[in-house]
Amino acid sequence: MSKVIGIDLGTTNSCVAVMEGGEAVVIPNAEGGRTTPSVVAFTKEGERIVGQVAKRQAITNPDRTVISIKRHMGTNYKVKIDNKEYTPQEISAMILQKLKADAEAYLGEKVTQAVITVPAYFTDSQRQATKDAGRIAGLEVLRIINEPTAASLAYGLDKGEDQTILVYDLGGGTFDVSILELGDGVFEVKATSGNNRLGGDDFDQRIMDYLVDICRREHGVDLTQDKMAMQRLKEAAEKAKIELSGMTSTNINLPFISATPNGPVHLDVNLTRAKFEELIADLVEKTVGPTRQALADAGLEPKDIDKVLLVGGSTRVPLVQETVRKILGQEPHKGINPDECVALGAAIQGGVLAGEVKDVLLLDVTPLSLGIETLGGVFTKLIERNTTIPTSKSQIFSTAADNQTTVEIHVLQGERAMAADNKTLGRFQLTGIPPAPRGVPQIEVKFDIDANGIVHVSAKDLGTGKQQAITITSSSGLSEEEIQRMVKEAEASAEADRRRKEEIETRNQADSLIYQAERTLKEFKDKADQNDVDRIEKAKKELQEVLDSKNNDKIKEKMEALSQALYTLTTKVYQQAGAQAGAQGQGAAGGQKQDGNVYDADYKVVDDDKKE
């Protein structure tokens, strides 16, 4: 059976891990990094690049670079590049393809199965979108698991004692808090809460807004109108945020950020940690409510928590750590890597599903209540939040009007009392109900939530036995046909990328061969046959002429001709050198005088020790 990889598909960075020898290990990417920026870019030549290389060129190519796509998962948002629209699922699939390729290169085998993590507070449509992204990337997604739960697996797999832990997960774009009970290989989530629109990206934005404001006040320039300048600000803000985790002050120096009629504009700002904390104070404060909510839902006090795990790069910010200390009254546990533990946990879950890891049971919960709209626009909950999944719940409803033959089931997710204030997951109709006074027909609505947290709903008329069932696909979801089309496009893109890589490698080999030919001619021109020299010159010229043609077969053909010409010349030169050396050796031996007589002689070994 092929390996099951664990993927943390993050807002700003992603990570992939696998079980090796009973341990979860992080797989480094092709560039040698342990995490991969969740950045996709399209060059003007149509080449698609992902990861560190894409992030590096973002300043010069801001219009064709996509960042933080995870924030748009489960929505109708589209990215438009070169008159082609891409869904968040497709962009995410490109990141997953890169992680898959890096894993295959590391393992030396094909990878087809994965466990992918999502924020605990992701809605059904966001989870479904993540699963679709995996399919488009050519992966069978065995399980979607929550990021805090994955982190707890990475932390607690080798811990024997029973304990209650709180996972505070603040990443690039999302915030989650989960409370779990660990013991005897059982990881049971007691409560979860969060905010899907809060993370390190928002911290960066606050620094950017601050810098834009300074530039406007001091130079009268609005940088928001210049995409390239904003991309430079984004990179500088992220760098400053990271530096302020270890230093109390940092310098942001951006020369030639813009220009005015009076000349170029240079931005040179000293940002202190105190000022940074002032800029983000209200954002960090937004994590307090969900943390207290999770404690209340679990029926626990801060003193009942044995360990606090910090997950996600944004938890390195000192103000965040100080806030956690204030809420929970204890020092957070620093024993896990906040950037890697989620992927490691996903790999462990992959090991559980593949049968590699024994005696581990993961019991997760649904983060939001599920229900339907009933008379008067009321939201009637069928499954309360923090219910352990997988789960199933049914309830009997009736018609709202006399002789009603059709019932529309409006499925929602959320915590508000009125249907309009909650998130619509989908709608479907149960038809063919026999005419009857209102309140007489009995309609059973059944909810199923699978282990991935994905919802399935059915409605049945108990009088006629008629049933209608759907797996929720929200208005932002993809149809099976769309997914299949995207899978084919992704495969075609992967093939195009492979060919492009092959072209580059062939070109590099050709450049190297031309250089080798020039060195050989320089070294042996005086000793070689002129015909052989001419043949190399001709073959070299022909290879140089086809180099820009992008015709790989033609380039290889001309490389072969040049290689052959070089081989012929060097063989002859070395043979010639060998023959000359042999002739000189013979001459030296023949030059010694001999008298023609041969003498026989006896010899005796003398032992010096016995000499007298």
From Swiss-Prot:
CDD domains: ASKHA_NBD_HSP70_DnaK-like
Residues carrying Phosphothreonine: T174
InterPro entries: ATPase_NBD, Chaperone_DnaK, Heat_shock_70_CS, HSP70_C_sf, HSP70_peptide-bd_sf, Hsp_70_fam
Pfam families found in the cross-reference section: HSP70 (PF00012)
Induction note: By stress conditions e.g. heat shock.
Job description of the protein: Acts as a chaperone.
Compositionally biased intervals (Basic and acidic residues): 601-612
Protein name (Swiss-Prot/TrEMBL): Chaperone protein DnaK
Keywords carried by this UniProt record: ATP-binding, Chaperone, Nucleotide-binding, Phosphoprotein, Stress response
GO-annotated molecular function: ATP binding; ATP-dependent protein folding chaperone; unfolded protein binding
Species annotation: Moorella thermoacetica (strain ATCC 39073 / JCM 9320)
Keyword presence, Zinc: no
Alphabetical list of PANTHER family matching this protein: HEAT SHOCK PROTEIN 70KDA (PTHR19375)
Family: Belongs to the heat shock protein 70 family.
Residue ranges of the region described as Disordered: 578-612
Record SUPFAM superfamilies: Actin-like ATPase domain, Heat shock protein 70kD (HSP70), C-terminal subdomain, Heat shock protein 70kD (HSP70), peptide-binding domain
Top-level taxon: Bacteria
